[in-house]
């Protein structure tokens, strides 16, 4: 009898785990951010979420991840990238936005059961890295203001997070404590969030029920664990000195200074506390 009960408990736990690996909703978000030249980005992200876990990602990038998840597919993709880079070098101008690439290689996986986020990203064009972060680094102050987004009544909340002040709008009508990027921890789904300077934000433009699997990241074993601030410092160094990054990889080119993108401290990342 005891063995039967144990089996049933294990069976029920297995069912629960399997159920929790599926999303309840899928939300599409438009990113608000700008290139160094002031041009607005036009990136799209999706959030697959249920009450205990979620995955935030760019669907185009995940499609490329799928195509390059085999050795042959990855080799073909790298050949295409190298050919594009050599063509740009021959023209005397490098624009990485025109290279075959993952449009936005960022993945944010959240687990409320563990109160941990796992963030996967790429340094440069070919260094997969990841780090983890506790939920406790984000705390909110809920206000009184309300507005309607996609037909849902939303409530204002504010937080100071990793160097920027953010204002979010969440709806208790969808009781999933999640949102775009790393945002979480409010008593309802976050449909809009913007930083005080207007340089970054996310706005929901579609919500639907979903039973899609919340899978991990393709090739997760290839990602190297790093420190969050160290990753941001490395990204900043690459942005400030892209030629040095190429030369460190054995790519020696001569590009006139006017063909290199200019960056300044005002053109900073979404997180600024790495300095």
Can you say where each PLM-predicted feature lies in the sequence?
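Extracellular or lumenal secretory-pathway regions
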Residues: 20-137, 143-146, 153, 198-275
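Structural motif
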Residues: 149-150, 161
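Bacterial Sec-dependent N-terminal signal peptides
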Residues: 1-25
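Gly/Pro-enriched, hydrophobic low-complexity segments
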Residues: 155-218
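Hydrophobic residues in beta-strands and at strand termini
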Residues: 142-143, 170
């Amino acid at each position: 009898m005891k063995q039967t009960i144990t089996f049933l408990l294990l069976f029920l736990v297995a069912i629960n785990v399997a159920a929790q690996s599926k999303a309840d909703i899928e939300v599409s978000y438009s990113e608000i951010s700008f290139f160094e030249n002031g041009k607005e980005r036009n990136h799209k992200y999706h959030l697959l979420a249920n009450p205990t876990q979620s995955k935030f990602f760019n669907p185009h990038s995940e499609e490329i991840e799928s195509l390059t998840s085999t050795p042959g597919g990855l080799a073909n993709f790298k050949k295409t990238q190298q050919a594009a880079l050599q063509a740009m070098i021959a023209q005397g101008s490098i624009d990485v936005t025109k290279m075959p690439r993952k449009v936005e290689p960022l993945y944010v996986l959240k687990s409320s059961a563990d109160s941990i986020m796992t963030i996967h990203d790429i340094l440069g064009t070919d260094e997969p890295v990841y780090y983890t972060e506790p939920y406790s680094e984000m705390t909110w102050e809920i206000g009184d203001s309300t507005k309607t987004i996609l037909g849902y009544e939303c409530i204002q909340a504010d937080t100071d997070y990793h160097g920027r002040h953010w204002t979010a709008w969440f709806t208790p009508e969808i009781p999933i404590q999640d949102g775009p990027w790393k945002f979480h921890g409010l008593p309802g789904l976050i449909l809009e969030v913007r930083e005080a300077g207007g340089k970054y934000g996310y706005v929901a433009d579609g919500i639907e029920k979903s039973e899609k699997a919340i899978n991990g990241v393709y090739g997760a074993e290839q990602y190297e664990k790093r420190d969050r601030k160290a990753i941001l410092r490395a990204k900043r160094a690459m942005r400030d000195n892209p030629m040095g990054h190429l030369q460190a990889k054995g790519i020696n080119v001569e590009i006139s200074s006017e063909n290199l993108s200019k960056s300044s401290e005002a053109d900073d990342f979404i997180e600024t506390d790495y300095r």
